[in-house]
């Protein structure tokens, strides 16, 4: 069975048991009245069941309801259908004031009907020939307004300076100031030029997101013809059907697949309504993607750190034990579905490098947008600074030093022999983003 953990906030006067049962029924065979066609099927076999209700500590009005829906209610290999069934109608339900899907358990029998990520972590490392460290990326800014040639130039400078990947911003599709084909060509030129000069494999996440599936495949085909290693998709705005289509194309044609989660906060920001990102992350692993953005943890609160690491493990590991302190409501066995690399991006710079290296470990992508391009000397030194900081942190960690305690010291030592890093350290020494975390247990 597929198990779902909901946080239910019933309307005043509605007991939590009734609200939980209503949620389970609406996600399966129930409707608002008894119908004669009920007699034509075995409702006992197909109905959803609410099997557990517990109070949410510290919140009088809400309860955590765990519902089970039989695997036969879902189409094989379709995340779209899974969500339509599990969360389709029930969120507008009159009896519940608010409803949040906290976690799903996907049984191995259902997991096996999905292709999952086109390649996974190990295959990606082998393709890129990069081992033993996180992968470095950078989003090209300003995200809108550059011409294709200048955009390609920015890409080249970053890759030449020492980054592994650069990235199209999620909003860069094919706008009047830069059509997709021109961008693809100039970025491919930047990739090949920087590869030839550095002897490392480089890539640029070419955003193939478009208005129709056919147009997306057309862009992916063009990327494959250019011989570039990776394309990108906005999986929530593009939709799961489009995402799975593109993921299948990527596996068949040897393209890596980077996933951006634009629009996720619309769904996962509220504590009492919507869906937690760990559900969207699980869905992405089934639908297919080699990288997915997953927040940064750095500079925020500890509570959020555990929760973020919870869904990061759900993305990377084969088997994840139930652990309520990290927000994981069910044990999840992925049965050999390839892993997804979590991408840390958003407001990070060289001073965060020790923390990022420690928190995310080697299997991750660290993405610095402004943290590369904001360097006072330009993109290439900015990229060089990030690479030096990363190598210093990995080396220190391998020597057994404590990155959490000695992080700043490690960066300062490295800055002594890298003027680029020293300049970066100077620029970003005071910047902090101090806000309360939304996502606490």
Swiss-Prot record:
Gene Ontology annotations of biological process type: photorespiration; reductive pentose-phosphate cycle
Enzyme class: lyase
CC cofactor: Mg(2+)
Transmembrane intervals: none
Coiled coil: none
Catalytic activity field: 2 (2R)-3-phosphoglycerate + 2 H(+) = D-ribulose 1,5-bisphosphate + CO2 + H2O; D-ribulose 1,5-bisphosphate + O2 = 2-phosphoglycolate + (2R)-3-phosphoglycerate + 2 H(+)
Modified residues (N6-carboxylysine): 167
Residues bound to Mg(2+): 167, 169-170
Catalytic residues identified in the record: 141, 260
Signal sequence extent: none
PTM entry text: The disulfide bond which can form in the large chain dimeric partners within the hexadecamer appears to be associated with oxidative stress and protein turnover.
Family annotation (PROSITE patterns): RUBISCO_LARGE
Entry's cofactor comment: Binds 1 Mg(2+) ion per subunit.
Xref: InterPro entries: RuBisCO (IPR033966), RuBisCo_large_chain_AS (IPR020878), RuBisCO_lsu_C (IPR000685), RuBisCO_lsu_C_sf (IPR036376), RuBisCO_lsu_fd_N (IPR017443), RuBisCO_lsu_N_sf (IPR036422), RuBisCO_lsuI (IPR020888)
Keyword Acetylation included in the entry's annotation: no
One Gene Ontology CC term in the entry: chloroplast
NCBIfam families: PRK04208.1
Alphabetical list of HAMAP family matching this protein: RuBisCO_L_type1
Miscellaneous field: The basic functional RuBisCO is composed of a large chain homodimer in a 'head-to-tail' conformation. In form I RuBisCO this homodimer is arranged in a barrel-like tetramer with the small subunits forming a tetrameric 'cap' on each end of the 'barrel'.
Function: RuBisCO catalyzes two reactions: the carboxylation of D-ribulose 1,5-bisphosphate, the primary event in carbon dioxide fixation, as well as the oxidative fragmentation of the pentose substrate in the photorespiration process. Both reactions occur simultaneously and in competition at the same active site.
Subunit structure comment from the entry: Heterohexadecamer of 8 large chains and 8 small chains; disulfide-linked. The disulfide link is formed within the large subunit homodimers.
Identification of the protein by name: Ribulose bisphosphate carboxylase large chain
Species assigned in the record: Viola sororia
